[in-house]
Swiss-Prot record:
EC number(s) given by UniProt: 2.4.1.-
Gene Ontology biological-process entries: glycolipid biosynthetic process; phosphatidylinositol metabolic process; phospholipid biosynthetic process
GO molecular function annotation: alpha-1,2-mannosyltransferase activity
Protein name, UniProt field: Polyprenol-phosphate-mannose-dependent alpha-(1-2)-phosphatidylinositol mannoside mannosyltransferase
Membrane is among the record's keywords: yes
InterPro entries listed in its UniProt record: GT87
Organismal lineage: Bacteria, Bacillati, Actinomycetota, Actinomycetes, Mycobacteriales
Pfam family, one: GT87
Family: Belongs to the glycosyltransferase 87 family.
Cellular component GO terms held in the UniProt record: plasma membrane
Segments traversing the membrane: 18-38, 101-121, 143-163, 191-211, 218-238, 279-299, 308-328, 331-346, 351-371, 386-406
The keyword Lipid biosynthesis is annotated on this UniProt entry: yes
Subcellular localization: Cell membrane
C-alpha cells in the first residue's frame, strides 16, 4: 500500500516545491521593480501638486480662485485640476515629506495595479484549474497578475509614465474595475464608480456600461454616490467647490496644451491642425458622436455575445478617445484591454482580437508617440501626425473589431465559463 502511495506523495511534494519556486520568481520580479522604482528618490510632479493642493485646503487657501498656480521645484507652475474632494482625500500626503509621498503613491499604485489585474483575470476566469499548481484559483491569478504587472511597470509606456508622474489613474481604474468586473460585490454595485466620478469626472462614461446592461440600480447607485461625495466636498470646502463646479470645470485649457504629442485623443489630434477654434470644436463634437455610436453598437453586440468584460474595455477606450484631455499616462486601461482581448481572442479563435492584443503591447513598449516631435507637433508632416495618434487608432480598431467579430457563437471553451461574467444586473 505504501509503495502505491509513494508516487502520489512525491508528486504532491513536487507540486508544492514548484509553487514555491513560482512565488520566488514573482518575488524576484517585484524586487527588480522595487529597485527600479525606489533605487533613487525620484521627483514625481503630480504627487507634488496633490500635496500642495491638500496643504492649500488645510490652510484655508483657495484651490482655484484667481487662477491659482502651484510652483514646483522644476520651474513649472501648474493648477490643481481635480474637484475639492480630491484635495481633502489627498490631505494625508500633505503631512509627508516629498520623498515619502512619492514612495507612498508608488506603493499604492503598484498594489492596486496588481489587485485590479487579478480581478480582471478572475472576471475572465483565467487559469481556472491546474494539475501542477496546488493552490486556489485566486492565488494562481494573483501570481499571474504579479508576473504581468512587473514588466508592465518598467517597459509599457502608459504604466511607466503613470508611475513617473505619481498619478492616480490606476486608483480611478481600480474603482471602476471593482464595480464592473466581479460577479458580485460586497457593496451596492455602482458605489465605487460614483466615488471615482466625484474624484475626476471622466469615469462617468462607465454609466453607459450599466445602462446598456439595463442595470438601472447600479447606475442610480453611482449617481447617488457621486452626489453624496460631491456634497461632502461642499461641506468641507464650500468656496472651492462652488468655484470648481460653476467656473473651473469648464476651462479645460488650464489642464495643459492639447497639442502636445502625449495628448492621445481626438481633441489633441485636432489641436495639432491649423484650423480655427470653431471648426476644431465642431469636428471634435462630430468625431465624438461617431465614436459614441460605434461604441454603443459594439457594446450591444459583445453584450449579446455574453462578453461583458469586453464591453467594459470598449467604454473605457471610448472615454479616452473622446475626452478633452487624455495624456498617455491616462491610458493605463490599455493593460487590462490587452489582457481581455488577448484571452478572448484565444478562447474564440479570433485572430483579429489576438493580433490587436499583441499590437497593443508593441505600441506600449515601443511607442510611436515620439515620432511626433514634442513642442513641434503642429508643424510635423502628415505621416508623423498619423503615427503620433497611435493609441487612438488602436482603441478605435479594438472597438470596431470587437463589434464585427465577437458574436454569440458558442465554443467549447466559452460554454464552460458562460456563467463567469461580471456585473450581473442584480447586485
Amino acid at each position: 500500500m505504501s509503495a502505491w502511495r509513494a508516487p502520489e506523495v512525491g508528486s504532491r511534494l513536487g507540486r508544492r516545491v514548484l509553487w514555491c519556486l513560482l512565488w520566488l520568481l514573482a518575488g524576484v520580479a517585484l524586487g527588480y521593480v522595487a529597485w527600479r522604482l525606489f533605487g533613487h528618490t525620484p521627483y514625481r510632479i503630480d504627487i507634488d501638486i496633490y500635496q500642495m493642493g491638500a496643504r492649500a485646503w488645510l490652510d484655508g487657501r483657495p484651490l482655484y480662485g484667481g487662477g491659482v498656480l502651484f510652483h514646483t521645484p522644476i520651474g513649472l507652475n501648474l493648477p490643481f485640476t481635480y474637484p475639492p474632494l480630491a484635495a481633502v482625500l489627498f490631505s494625508p500626503f500633505a503631512w509627508l515629506q516629498m520623498p515619502a509621498a512619492s514612495v507612498a503613491i508608488t506603493v499604492l499604485t503598484l498594489v492596486l495595479l496588481i489587485a485590479s489585474t487579478a480581478i480582471v483575470l478572475t472576471g475572465l476566469d483565467a487559469w481556472p484549474t491546474s494539475r501542477l499548481v496546488p493552490a486556489p484559483a485566486r492565488l494562481r491569478r494573483l501570481w499571474l497578475a504579479v508576473l504581468i504587472v512587473a514588466p508592465a511597470t518598467i517597459w509599457l509606456e502608459p504604466i511607466s509614465s503613470n508611475f513617473a508622474f505619481g498619478q492616480i489613474n490606476v486608483v480611478l481604474m481600480t474603482l471602476v474595475i471593482v464595480d464592473c468586473f466581479p460577479r458580485r460585490t460586497p457593496w451596492p454595485r455602482g458605489l465605487m464608480l460614483g466615488l471615482g466620478i466625484a474624484l475626476k469626472l471622466t469615469p462617468a462614461v462607465f454609466l453607459l456600461y450599466f445602462l446598456l446592461r439595463r442595470d438601472g440600480r447600479a447606475a442610480l447607485t453611482a449617481l447617488a454616490s457621486f452626489a453624496v461625495a460631491t456634497l461632502l466636498g461642499f461641506v468641507l470646502a464650500w468656496r472651492d467647490s462652488w468655484e470648481y463646479w460653476t467656473h473651473t470645470l469648464h476651462h479645460t485649457d488650464r489642464i495643459g496644451a492639447a497639442a502636445l504629442n502625449t495628448d492621445q485623443n481626438i481633441a489633441g489630434a485636432l489641436a495639432r491642425l491649423t484650423i480655427g477654434d470653431d471648426e476644431r470644436f465642431a469636428l471634435w463634437v462630430a468625431g465624438s458622436l461617431l465614436v459614441l455610436a460605434a461604441t454603443i453598437w459594439a457594446m450591444r453586440r459583445v453584450l449579446r455575445a455574453g462578453e461583458p468584460t469586453l464591453a467594459v474595455i470598449c467604454v473605457a477606450l471610448f472615454g479616452l478617445v473622446v475626452s478633452p484631455v487624455s495624456w498617455s499616462h491616462h491610458w493605463v486601461w490599455m493593460l487590462p484591454a490587452v489582457l481581455v482581448i488577448g484571452l478572448l481572442g484565444w478562447r474564440r479563435r479570433n485572430v483579429a482580437l489576438a493580433m490587436l492584443s499583441l499590437a497593443g503591447v508593441v505600441l506600449m513598449r515601443w511607442t510611436p508617440i515620439d515620432l511626433l516631435p514634442q513642442h513641434r507637433e503642429t508643424t510635423a508632416v502628415w505621416w508623423r501626425q498619423l503615427a503620433g495618434m497611435s493609441y487612438v487608432w488602436w482603441a478605435l480598431a479594438v472597438i470596431v473589431v470587437a463589434g464585427l467579430t465577437v458574436t454569440a457563437r458558442m465554443t467549447p471553451q466559452r460554454s464552460l465559463t458562460r456563467g463567469l461574467t461580471p456585473a450581473p444586473t442584480a447586485s
